[in-house]
Amino acid sequence: MSSSPSLNTWSDALSGLSIGWFPLGLVIIAAIPLVFIALYALTYGVYGERKISAFMQDRLGPMEVGIWGLLQTLADILKLLQKEDIVPKLADKFLFVIGPGILFVGSFLAFAVLPFGPAFIGADLNVGLFYAVGIVAIEVVGILAAGWGSNNKWALYGAVRSVAQIVSYEIPASIALLCAAMLAGTLSMQQITMMQAGPGGFMHWFLFTNPIAWLPFLIYFISSLAETNRAPFDIPEAESELVAGYFTEYSGMKFAVIFLAEYGRMFMVSAIISIAFLGGWTSPLPNIGGLELNTMTSGPVWGAFWIIMKGFFFIFVQMWLRWTLPRLRVDQLMYLCWKVLTPFSLIAFVLTAIWVINH
């Protein structure tokens, strides 16, 4: 399915304005709404996790600040702003300061290629999927900088664990996403989404048009849990062993930035799996006879709604698993990656290639 001529990026739309600004400024302006939306959503992701954990443990959770505790996250931000920003005496101050910044930037750079609708995308790169996967390498640098710069053995152990885990699970995750790229015949995330659009709604999604797609779908979801250090793969932050992992020595807003970067990664991988296998911003509702549900629930605003809801669904599953599954051991973690997920991802790759050739 070819892309529609109306698929304009935000930067393209803004470049038509006769304001005489440098194009880079237009790109920055185009990114501002996306950044604010992401920050707002991720900030309340913290509130959502607190409420979900409270439900799992049969308690109320935040209730004091605002109605139903809705302003609790804002209160936490104000509290962190007032906390002392402590830098350990023997720490490498440059690495200690730049580590959280690299993590934050790395988490949000991938948002530039995530299509939030037919026209809501920062940059429709023809290698967008490759870019989104490769951007994880920047986060690895930030984690190492934070762990090494802290001059704390627990922080360093946590950083080494995290880097080994991310690099290892990046292999099955990348191969799983290549299966979706083969089905679509492109690495453009916008084009992958368009290939799954149609009046049949969810029946056009790769997960329902190709029985083999369930295998790379599950492989990527499991790998994404490891890449974001979420339970049961939260070994780099094991409280009973490493205090808090690579951010043990951080306080104040530096701690808040690292925390926010983690939720940014959670939404990023959730959006990627939604785009690769579940139609991204396309509506799940099909047209049934004269009832054109798909047509009525499609368009720019609906597109943003659908991909955000799909992303939030997978974030909910990640939070749910945190309070359901126990933490794996290091040997179990690596065994799962190298002897289970990687071989099965290669099998999925071969089966997908055979499917594409024969269809």
From Swiss-Prot:
Function recorded in the entry: NDH-1 shuttles electrons from NADH, via FMN and iron-sulfur (Fe-S) centers, to quinones in the respiratory chain. The immediate electron acceptor for the enzyme in this species is believed to be ubiquinone. Couples the redox reaction to proton translocation (for every two electrons transferred, four hydrogen ions are translocated across the cytoplasmic membrane), and thus conserves the redox energy in a proton gradient. This subunit may bind ubiquinone.
Keyword Disulfide bond: no
Assembly and oligomerization: NDH-1 is composed of 14 different subunits. Subunits NuoA, H, J, K, L, M, N constitute the membrane sector of the complex.
Protein name: NADH-quinone oxidoreductase subunit H
Subcellular location: Cell inner membrane
GO cellular component entries: plasma membrane
Entry's EC annotation: 7.1.1.-
Record-level Gene Ontology MF annotations: NADH dehydrogenase activity; oxidoreductase activity, acting on NAD(P)H, quinone or similar compound as acceptor; quinone binding
Family: Belongs to the complex I subunit 1 family.
Entry keyword set: Cell inner membrane, Cell membrane, Membrane, NAD, Quinone, Translocase, Transmembrane, Transmembrane helix, Ubiquinone
Reaction catalyzed: a quinone + NADH + 5 H(+)(in) = a quinol + NAD(+) + 4 H(+)(out)
UniProt-listed HAMAP family: NDH1_NuoH
Organism domain of life: Bacteria
Membrane topology field: Multi-pass membrane protein
PROSITE patterns hit by this protein: COMPLEX1_ND1_1, COMPLEX1_ND1_2
Transmembrane domains' residue ranges: 19-39, 94-114, 127-147, 166-186, 202-222, 266-286, 301-321, 337-357
Gene Ontology annotations of biological process type: aerobic respiration
Pfam families, alphabetized: NADHdh
Matching InterPro entries: NADH_UbQ_OxRdtase_su1/FPO (IPR001694), NADH_UbQ_OxRdtase_su1_CS (IPR018086)
